[in-house]
UniProtKB/Swiss-Prot annotation:
Lineage of source species: Bacteria, Pseudomonadati, Pseudomonadota, Gammaproteobacteria, Pasteurellales
Enzyme Commission number: 4.3.2.10, 3.5.1.2
UniProt cross-references to InterPro entries, sorted A to Z: Class_I_gatase-like, GATASE, Imidazole-glycPsynth_HisH
Keywords carried by this UniProt record: Amino-acid biosynthesis, Cytoplasm, Glutamine amidotransferase, Histidine biosynthesis, Hydrolase, Lyase
GO cellular component annotations of the record: cytoplasm
Name of the featured protein: Imidazole glycerol phosphate synthase subunit HisH
GO molecular function, one term: glutaminase activity
PANTHER family according to UniProt: IMIDAZOLE GLYCEROL PHOSPHATE SYNTHASE SUBUNIT HISH
Gene3D superfamilies from the UniProt entry: 3.40.50.880
Organism field: Mannheimia succiniciproducens (strain KCTC 0769BP / MBEL55E)
Catalysis: reaction(s): 5-[(5-phospho-1-deoxy-D-ribulos-1-ylimino)methylamino]-1-(5-phospho-beta-D-ribosyl)imidazole-4-carboxamide + L-glutamine = D-erythro-1-(imidazol-4-yl)glycerol 3-phosphate + 5-amino-1-(5-phospho-beta-D-ribosyl)imidazole-4-carboxamide + L-glutamate + H(+); L-glutamine + H2O = L-glutamate + NH4(+)
Ranges of residues in domain Glutamine amidotransferase type-1: 1-194
Location in or out of the cell: Cytoplasm
Entry keyword annotation includes Lyase: yes
Length: 194
């Protein structure tokens, strides 16, 4: 398992989540290491524009786009998997169709921060052993509205994609590394089931 070094603040907490599961995970920005990994994790905290600049500066965009092994994007990492983010009006990785936009104003404060229910497609391997409508921890102001790649949803005034999946690329808007036993189970499922 390689955690792609995106320079974001949650790298250590993501690695520690795998350590707690006794799953060997290494943080790397080395292209050869990333290409040879059996699984990849794309974390992200911050803005889409800053994250894409870091990936470009580290020559990682093409490597990520050409990955054939299972990859899990977390929070901003999931948003980067779509085609475009209105946060900075920046093209993203285009690993799947869709775009990321500011959560519509429904009177609820932004960012959406805290625990929220997640409803997933029945029998999806990413959510194996996790009860329907379980709670996960979110911190975000931008979201991907439900589309053909949505495998789980949550609601914050409007429904949004809590998880996406397309081919070997998966993403979660919530932070599994901060979501207790449900988050730990999801990370374990990613490693063992996908």
């Amino acid at each position: 398992m390689i955690i792609i070094d995106t320079g974001c603040a949650n790298l250590s907490s993501v690695k520690f989540a795998f350590d707690r599961l006794n799953i060997k995970a290494e943080i790397s920005r080395d292209i050869a290491t990333i290409k040879s990994a059996d699984k990849l994790l794309l974390p992200g905290v911050g803005t889409a524009m800053a994250a894409m600049k870091i990936l470009q500066d580290r020559n990682l965009i093409e490597t990520i786009q050409n990955a054939t092994q299972p990859m899990l994007g977390i929070c901003l990492g999931m948003q980067l998997m779509t085609e475009y983010s209105s946060e900075g009006n920046v093209p993203t990785l285009s690993l799947m169709s869709g775009h990321t936009d500011l959560i519509p104003n429904t009177g609820l404060p932004l960012p959406h921060m805290g625990w929220n229910k997640v409803r997933y497609e029945q029998d999806h391997p990413l959510f194996a052993g996790i009860e329907q409508d379980s709670h996960f921890y979110f911190v975000h102001s931008y979201a991907v509205l439900p589309n053909e790649h949505t495998i789980a949803t949550s609601d914050y005034g409007v429904p949004f994609s809590a998880a996406l999946g397309c081919k070997n690329f998966y993403g979660v808007q919530f932070h599994p590394e901060r979501s207790g036993k449900n988050g730990a189970q999801l990370l374990k499922n990613f490693v063992e089931n996908l």
